[in-house]
Amino acid sequence: MKTRLIIFLMCLFAWFSGADTHAQTDVKHLSWGKVANNMPTEWYNSEQARNIADQLLARQMDCGGWQKNIPYHHLLTDAELAKVRRTGVGATIDNGATTTEMRFLARVYACCGDARYKDAFVKGLHYLFEAQYDNGGWPQFNPPRGKAHYSSHITYNDNAMVNVLRLLREVSENDSPFDGLRLSDSLREQAQKSFDKGIDCILKTQIRIDGKPTVWCAQHDEKTFAPAPARAYELVSFSGS
C-alpha cells in the first residue's frame, strides 16, 4: 500500500512539473499569429496565455479593434501599458489585425471561462459590424487614416476582407473555437448577414470587360466599386496585390 502511494505521489509530481514547464513555453521567438492560432489546445488554459489575454484587453482600442503589426505576446510592463493609446486612428483589419486577437481571446475563453475575454471578443465583433459599409465592404482602417486616404477603400489586399469573412462565417456556424463562447443566436445571425453582405460586395466589385466578369484589384473605391490605387507603387490594376 505504501509503495503504491509513493508511486502515485511521484507520478503526480511529474505531471505537475510537466504542466508547469508546458505552461511557461518560450513564445517570444514565435510569431504572434502562431501563438494566437497554433499552440496546443491545453496551452490556452495556461497562466501564460491568460497573461497575454489580459494584455489584449488593455490594448484593445475603445472602438473595439486592435492595431496591426504588434507582437502582443511580448508583454508590456504596467508603466508601458499606461502609455498605450486607445483612441483615435489605429484599429484595422490589415495584416490580420483584430481578427487574430479575437481568435486568441476565443481560445482562451473556451479554456478558462473568464467573462472579460468574451466581452472583449464581442466588442471586437461589433467593431467589425460597425466598420462594414452599407454596400458590404470593409475599409482597411476604421476610422480611416485621414480625409481621402486609401485606407477608406474596400480592401482585399493582404486578405483583409477575407480574414473578416472567414471569422464571421465560423462565428455564424458556431465553429471552433467560437462555439466555446456560446454566443447568442442574434449575434450569430448578425454575423451571417454581415458575411452575406460581404460576399455580395465581392461580386459587385468584380472587374467586367465587355460585360464579362474577370478579376479584382487589391482595393476598390468604396462608392463606385472601381479599382482604386493605394500606396505610390500600388496602382490601379487587374491583380490581387
Which sequence ranges carry the predicted segments?
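Low-complexity, Ser/Thr/Pro/Gly-enriched N-terminal "stalk/linker" regions
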Residues: 24-88, 209-212
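Long, well-ordered core segments of solenoidal/helical folds
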Residues: 52-64, 120-137, 192-211
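Carbohydrate-binding/catalytic loop surfaces
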Residues: 71-89, 139-159, 212-239
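Bacterial N-terminal signal peptides
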Residues: 7-17
